[in-house]
Amino acid sequence: MAQVQYYGTGRRKSSVARVRLVPGEGRIVVNNREISEHIPSAALIEDIKQPLTLTETAGTYDVLVNVHGGGLSGQAGAIRHGIARALLEADPEYRTTLKRAGLLTRDARMKERKKYGLKGARRAPQFSKR
């Protein structure tokens, strides 16, 4: 018999995470490595686990993730978004809990582009009065 799986795609900055939830004991595997190997920061790992702790499903699913693009923070945000969407597919009753915590909303903040005539997005060259 085929195993039950729930899918969710999460995005943040320039990172994209494809998340699969499989019934298990709570392991999180990112790009075929344990989460602590891929993301060294404990704060980011807590951030990733937030949807599971809010819905009290922390020990019921194994989370298998493929993530690419961006840096560690962007990837963590993408994984969190993907887990929230996959949990929603698993049980639609989680919608209110996840929505209230803001986990279903795609964070649209992106890096602002550098403008010509400026040193950065907003940083102007030094001004000299004389």
Curated annotation (Swiss-Prot):
GO terms for biological process: translation. One of its GO terms (molecular function) is RNA binding. Keywords: Ribonucleoprotein, Ribosomal protein. Pfam families: Ribosomal_S9. The keyword Calcium does not apply. Signal peptide: none annotated. Transmembrane segments: none annotated. GO terms for cellular component: cytosolic small ribosomal subunit. The keyword Ribonucleoprotein applies. Belongs to the universal ribosomal protein uS9 family. HAMAP family: Ribosomal_uS9_B. Part of the 30S ribosomal subunit. This is Small ribosomal subunit protein uS9.
